[in-house]
């Protein structure tokens, strides 16, 4: 049985899925870049976090479907960083914003 969401809930769900898409792509891209920077250990961590974020997105997508909301396909802007330090700084800032 599909439930209809309020406009407030729709907005919240759209923001949540946009953030999860954002961080999934950001961590995935950092995983690829870290491998190129010869930092296999950190690359593995970025990969694990990207997968976890994709699972979060899946859970939100299930709720979006339940409430019959048309999901956004536009993530919030990503900031990858060019160095490992910049990557970690971007990720830390993003984590603080979403707590």
Regions found by a protein language model. Name each.
Residues 12-19, 24-28, 91:
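A structural feature that tracks compact, well-ordered secondary-structure segments
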Residues 97-99:
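Conserved small/polar residues in nucleotide/adenosyl-binding loops
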Residues 2-12, 74-94:
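Acidic/His metal-coordination segments adjacent to aromatic residues that form catalytic metal sites
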Residues 23-26, 34-74:
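Conserved alpha-helical segments that form or flank metal/cofactor-binding pockets of metalloenzymes
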């Amino acid at each position: 049985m599909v439930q209809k969401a309020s406009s407030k809930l729709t907005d919240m769900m759209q923001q949540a899925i946009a953030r999860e898409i954002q961080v999934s792509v950001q961590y995935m891209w950092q995983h690829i870049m870290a491998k190129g920077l010869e930092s296999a250990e950190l690359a593995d961590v970025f990969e694990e976090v990207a997968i976890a974020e994709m699972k979060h997105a899946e859970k939100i997508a299930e709720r979006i479907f339940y409430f019959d909301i048309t999901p956004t396909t536009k993530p919030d802007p990503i900031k990858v960083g060019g160095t490992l330090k910049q990557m970690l700084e971007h990720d830390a800032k993003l984590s603080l914003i979403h707590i």
